């Protein structure tokens, strides 16, 4: 329903994860009977989680570890891992930068060009461990580097930018034709981000197997303040899910909706899937792992843009191992550990046994969900406080 912004402008009301609640149904289910797997092209993935293609979150070791746990780690092929043979010292420098110098320091570190040989080396390193090898490139550089990535054994390509559309217009060069490019590739492609029904639908029509949904919700992203663009995630995901339904009616093909950003706790992942997501791409929750390359830091991949940075470096507390954060066991009670356990139990409490079934769960607008009755927790900064 549209509301009046002013006499000359109307708009829709949109909702984030904190604005909504999942409603339990008349049936409950044993958590052990819940199947959280999903399909990405020809690949069956055990857990509906992808680690964001961010340098403080994923390096080859983390991608391998996540793959063995049942998820996916997306390596950024334009990041620090492909600019330096030994990125360790540069990651240490990023971690040591004072807040006032962080953006300038990142701009300097990322001034080094991407080295194609390192793209091949990193992909082969992950591939050698027998896990699904997934990596990202921007639309601006994907044609330049895709061949070396494919030759090294890339399994799934992610074409990712702040906002990616199927109809980019440019007067200064020939824009990437996504539909033609994807059709010519021998591997499945995920593309995004987007945050609206129409953009998601047109991206699905390019032949992508998945669409990333999220513009600016991430913990280290400042896009929404710098350019004022974005849509709260619950609404953005639900709109993309509507586009998926329309696309399926048109073609008979199912395209995955992947919620990208804005999730910190197990309940957030559950809400994303309840709104229509098939899987969740997360960054800051995994940046808190002891194995994360950020050394207790997390930064957006537009932070080092030379002209208009749209991200920041944030400090994250190391709260556990990658395994503990993803699948437990948890030793905290706020939902930041055992994310998949939180999702599994949400599905069980509502009586659903698959991801696609759980997308049908009832959701209501409930802005008091996280505060109702929680004054003691808030006053003591424990639990949900």
What is each PLM-predicted segment?
Residues 1-26, 110-114, 118-124, 190, ...:
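Alpha/beta catalytic cores of nucleotide-metabolism and tRNA/nucleoside-modifying enzymes
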Residues 1-250, 286:
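Active-site entrance/lid segments in N-terminal catalytic domains of soluble metabolic enzymes
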């Amino acid at each position: 329903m549209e509301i009046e912004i002013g006499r000359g402008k109307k708009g829709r009301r949109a909702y984030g994860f904190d604005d909504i609640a999942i409603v339990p149904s008349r049936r409950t289910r044993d958590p052990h009977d819940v199947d959280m797997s999903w399909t990405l092209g020809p690949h069956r993935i055990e857990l509906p989680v992808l680690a964001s293609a961010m340098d403080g979150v994923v390096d080859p070791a983390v991608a391998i570890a996540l793959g063995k746990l049942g998820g996916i780690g997306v390596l950024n092929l334009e990041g620090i891992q492909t600019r330096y043979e030994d990125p360790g010292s540069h990651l240490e420098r990023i971690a040591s930068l004072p807040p006032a110098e962080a953006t300038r320091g990142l701009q300097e570190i990322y001034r080094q060009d991407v080295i194609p040989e390192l793209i091949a080396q990193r992909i082969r390193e992950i591939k050698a461990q027998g896990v699904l090898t997934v990596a990202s490139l921007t639309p601006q550089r994907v044609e330049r580097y895709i061949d070396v990535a494919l030759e090294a054994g890339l399994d799934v390509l992610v074409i990712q930018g702040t906002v990616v559309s199927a109809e980019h217009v440019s007067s200064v060069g020939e824009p990437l034709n996504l539909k033609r490019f994807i059709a010519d590739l021998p591997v499945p492609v995920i593309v995004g981000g987007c945050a609206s029904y129409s953009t998601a639908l047109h991206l699905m029509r390019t032949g992508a197997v998945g669409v990333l949904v999220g513009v600016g919700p991430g913990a280290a992203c400042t896009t929404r303040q710098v350019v004022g663009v974005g849509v709260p995630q619950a609404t953005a995901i639900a709109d993309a899910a509507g586009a998926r339904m329309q696309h399926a009616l048109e073609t008979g093909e199912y395209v995955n909706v992947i919620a990208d950003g804005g999730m910190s706790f197990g309940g957030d992942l559950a809400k994303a899937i309840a709104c229509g997501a098939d899987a969740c791409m997360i960054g800051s929750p995994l940046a808190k792992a002891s194995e994360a390359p950020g050394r207790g830091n997390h930064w957006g991949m537009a932070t080092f843009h030379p002209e208009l940075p749209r991200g920041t470096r944030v400090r994250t507390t190391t709260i556990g191992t990658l395994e503990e954060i993803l699948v437990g066991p948890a030793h905290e009670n706020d939902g930041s550990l055992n994310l998949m356990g939180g999702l599994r139990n949400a599905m069980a409490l509502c009586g659903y046994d698959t991801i696609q079934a759980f997308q049908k769960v009832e959701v209501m607008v409930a802005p008091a969900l996280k505060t109702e009755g929680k004054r003691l927790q808030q006053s003591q900064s424990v639990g949900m406080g």
